[in-house]
Curated annotation (Swiss-Prot):
Residues 12-71 form the SH3 domain. One of its GO terms (cellular component) is cytoplasm. One of its GO terms (biological process) is signal transduction. Induces bone resorption, acting probably through a signaling cascade which results in the secretion of factor(s) enhancing osteoclast formation and activity. This is Osteoclast-stimulating factor 1. The modification Phosphoserine is found at residues 202, 213. Interacts with SRC and SMN1. Interacts with FASLG. It comes from Bos taurus. ANK repeats lie at residues 72-101, 105-135, 139-168. It is found in: Cytoplasm. The lineage of its organism: Eukaryota, Metazoa, Chordata, Craniata, Vertebrata. Keywords: Acetylation, ANK repeat, Cytoplasm, Phosphoprotein, Repeat, SH3 domain. InterPro entries: Ankyrin_rpt, Ankyrin_rpt-contain_sf, SH3-like_dom_sf, SH3_domain. The SH3 domain mediates interaction with SMN1. SUPFAM superfamilies: Ankyrin repeat (SSF48403), SH3-domain (SSF50044).
Length: 214
């Protein structure tokens, strides 16, 4: 009886490594990669042979080689976002690296893309259907706080258009508006908060009208 196929890896469970040496396959099933290549391990169910992808090719790698001859990359999506490396970010997403993973600071890749002013990275992350806009890190800051603090009005606008919340306060009780370092960011945030306030008031009036009509 053949053993069942391994379960597909869930996003975020992919392990990512950077090869320290070139690996020459001995069989057609094995994966060739060179020193410095990024390897995405998608199946570790076999203790001796792991399934991995490198440069669009998939194959088997001896697990002991990865353990001894490769460097683990803990937060590859975050690293790509910080550097503004769009091709690496796209490769991470194509290989099912989790889009909402948190680093040691509790920040998402989106936070770092906004912090660095990398508009193309932000737009690429927005193509992911489950992207979390309002995740607060250990300081309580969101991606919107980061963009406002660094003065990237174009990214503030992108976040607001996507539906980012303006009412979240960080650990210092500051809104993104309080963190804004230029007039353009402050203006966008004030306008959005004003629109939200009017909408909330309108909803409250509609609710009261409904109560009166009962």
């Amino acid at each position: 009886m053949s053993k069942p196929p391994p379960k597909p890896v869930k996003p975020g469970q992919v392990k990512v490594f950077r090869a320290l040496y070139t690996f020459e396959p001995r069989t057609p099933d094995e994966l060739y990669f060179e020193e410095g290549d990024i390897i995405y391990i998608t199946d570790m169910s076999d203790t001796n042979w792991w399934k991995g992808t490198c440069k669009g090719r998939t194959g088997l790698i001896p697990s002991n080689y990865v353990a001894e001859q490769a460097e683990s990359i803990d937060n590859p999506l975050h690293e790509a976002a910080k550097r503004g490396n769009l091709s690496w970010l796209r490769e991470c997403l194509d290989n099912r690296v989790g889009v909402n993973g948190l680093d040691k600071a509790g920040s998402t890749a989106l936070y770092w893309a906004c912090h660095g002013g990398h508009r193309d990275i932000v737009e690429m992350l927005f193509t992911q259907p489950n992207i979390e806009l309002n995740q607060q890190n250990k300081l309580g800051d969101t991606a919107l706080h980061a963009a406002a603090w660094k003065g990237y009005a174009d990214i503030v606008q992108l976040l607001l258009e996507k539906g980012a919340r303006t009412d979240l306060r960080n650990n210092e009780k500051k809104l993104a508006l309080d963190m804004a370092t230029n007039a353009a960011c402050a203006s966008l945030l004030k306008k959005k908060q004003g629109t939200d306030a009017v909408r909330s008031l309108s909803n409250a009036e509609d609710y009261l009208d409904d109560e009166d009509s009962d």
